[in-house]
C-alpha cells in the first residue's frame, strides 16, 4: 500500500510539473489536448491501406476513432485525446484491402522533429489480449536504419509495458528491449507517465519518473550502427493484433494476436486509449 501511495503522489507531481512546463524555456513541444479538435499544425493523422506486422486494423481519419473529451472526469488535467478502436466489418481501404477494425494513429512528422532531450506522455489504456497501443518515435528514411524508439508499448497484459530500440542489426525481435512490471495495485488501465531521456550516447526509459531501462551507444554497437543521432518525430497509435501480441498471447483466432474477449471489448465500445498530454523538452 505504501508503494502504491508513493507512486500516486509521484504521478500527481509529474502531471502538474508537465503542465507547468509549457511556459518554460526548455519546452520544445507541449500538447494537452484541451481543444475540441486535433491541432493539425502539430499533428498528422495517418490513413493506412496496407498494414504491417499482421495487424488487424486500418487507420482512418475520423472523429469516431480520434476525438476529445473533458478529461477531468477521467482523471486528466484538462482535455484528453481518445483513440478508440471500432469494429467495422467490411471496411475497405483505398487499396481495396478489407478490414474488420478501424483505429487511430497520429504523428508529428515534419511538424515537430527533435534530436536529444526528453519526451513524455501521460496515458490511460484499456487492457485485453491483442490490444496494442504505443507511444514511440521514428526518424525519417528507411526503417530500421532511421532508428525507432519505443517509449511505451503494451499488448494487452495490463501488468506490464515494454521499452525497445530498433535500428540496423537490432530490429524486429530486437535484443534491446525490456519488460517493466507494474507495482502491485496498479496497471496500464490507470494513469501513468511514460518517458524517455535521449542523449548523444544513451536512451533512458522511465515509468512515472522511475528509470526502467537504459541503453547506451556501445550496447547498440554490438549489433549495428547507433541510429539515434538524427531527428525523430513522435507517434501515438492503437493497433490490434499482429506479430508482437501473437508472440505473447499465442492467439490465432478469431484474429491473429487478438482474442475473442478483446473483440468483445471493442464491439462494446470499451477499447480506448486516453492521452492527457505530450511533452518534449530539450
Model regions and ranges:
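GH16 jelly-roll
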Residues: 21-282
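Bacterial Sec-dependent N-terminal signal peptides
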Residues: 1-23
Amino acid at each position: 500500500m505504501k508503494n502504491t501511495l508513493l507512486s500516486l503522489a509521484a504521478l500527481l507531481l509529474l502531471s502538474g510539473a508537465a503542465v507547468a512546463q509549457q511556459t518554460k524555456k526548455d519546452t520544445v513541444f507541449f500538447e494537452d489536448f484541451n481543444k475540441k479538435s486535433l491541432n493539425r499544425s502539430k499533428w498528422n493523422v495517418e490513413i493506412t491501406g496496407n498494414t504491417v506486422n499482421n495487424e488487424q486494423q486500418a487507420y482512418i481519419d475520423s472523429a469516431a476513432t480520434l476525438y476529445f473529451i473533458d478529461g477531468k472526469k477521467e482523471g486528466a488535467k484538462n482535455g484528453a485525446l481518445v483513440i478508440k478502436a471500432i469494429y467495422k466489418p467490411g471496411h475497405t481501404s483505398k487499396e481495396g484491402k478489407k478490414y474488420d477494425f478501424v483505429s487511430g494513429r497520429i504523428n508529428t512528422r515534419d511538424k515537430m522533429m527533435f534530436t536529444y532531450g526528453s519526451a513524455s506522455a501521460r496515458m490511460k489504456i484499456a487492457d485485453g489480449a491483442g490490444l496494442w497501443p504505443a507511444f514511440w518515435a521514428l526518424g525519417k528514411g528507411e526503417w530500421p536504419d532511421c532508428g525507432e524508439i519505443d517509449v511505451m508499448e503494451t499488448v494487452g497484459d495490463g501488468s506490464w509495458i515494454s521499452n525497445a530500440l530498433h535500428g540496423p542489426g537490432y530490429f524486429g525481435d530486437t535484443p534491446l528491449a525490456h519488460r517493466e512490471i507494474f507495482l502491485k495495485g496498479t496497471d496500464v488501465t490507470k494513469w501513468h507517465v511514460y518517458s524517455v531521456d535521449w542523449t548523444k550516447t544513451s536512451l533512458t526509459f522511465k515509468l512515472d519518473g522511475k528509470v526502467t531501462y537504459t541503453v547506451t551507444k556501445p550496447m547498440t554497437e554490438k549489433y549495428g550502427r547507433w541510429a539515434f543521432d538524427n531527428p525523430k518525430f513522435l507517434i501515438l497509435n492503437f493497433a490490434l493484433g499482429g506479430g508482437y501480441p501473437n508472440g505473447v498471447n499465442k492467439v490465432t483466432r478469431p484474429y491473429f494476436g487478438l482474442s475473442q474477449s478483446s473483440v468483445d471489448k471493442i464491439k462494446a465500445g470499451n477499447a480506448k486509449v486516453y492521452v492527457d498530454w505530450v511533452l518534449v523538452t530539450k
